[in-house]
């Protein structure tokens, strides 16, 4: 929320996921970004996965989990980081100064937790399978104008 002002809270996203799945709408969550030293602790990851399980999501994508800082957004990211998280700014500089990809030190543990949770609850996490699903998903609303507000 601090780095991306205006974004909805996880609890708000959970509420929307529940509303969608209750209406039979397939939900795939893109679990990203996972930011080192900010939201990469296992308690946070397990909390996010718990939301997904409770909401009954179809799948969880993780291929964009590690942010890639390209020219332009790198400067903005570090400005926001310094402004909102000055206590960890130096850690980022020390660990990620020359890195484009912000891969958390917990990456392997996080991926294992995601895999175990998905397998235990029948949630799809294979990227290729999720992409295949989205390509083959039959649009049952052709010719119908939808509004997100009709669902609330």
Name these PLM-found stretches.
Residues 78-152:
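C-terminal accessory extensions appended to soluble enzyme cores
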Residues 1-92, 99:
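Conserved AdoMet/S-adenosylmethionine-binding subsite of the radical SAM
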């Amino acid at each position: 929320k601090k780095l991306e002002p205006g974004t909805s809270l996880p609890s708000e996203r959970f509420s929307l996921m529940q509303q969608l799945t209750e209406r039979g709408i397939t939900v795939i969550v893109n679990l990203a970004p996972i930011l080192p030293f900010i939201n990469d602790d296992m308690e946070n990851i397990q909390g996010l996965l718990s939301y997904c399980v409770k909401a009954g999501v179809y799948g969880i994508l993780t291929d964009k989990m590690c942010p890639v800082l390209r020219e332009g957004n790198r400067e903005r990211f570090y400005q926001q980081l310094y402004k909102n998280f000055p206590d960890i700014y130096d850690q980022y500089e020390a660990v990620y100064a020359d890195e484009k990809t912000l891969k958390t030190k917990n990456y392997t543990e996080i991926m294992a937790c995601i895999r175990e949770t998905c397998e235990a609850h029948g949630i799809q996490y294979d990227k290729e399978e999720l992409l295949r699903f989205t390509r083959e998903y039959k649009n049952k609303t052709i010719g119908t104008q939808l509004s997100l507000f009709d669902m609330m």
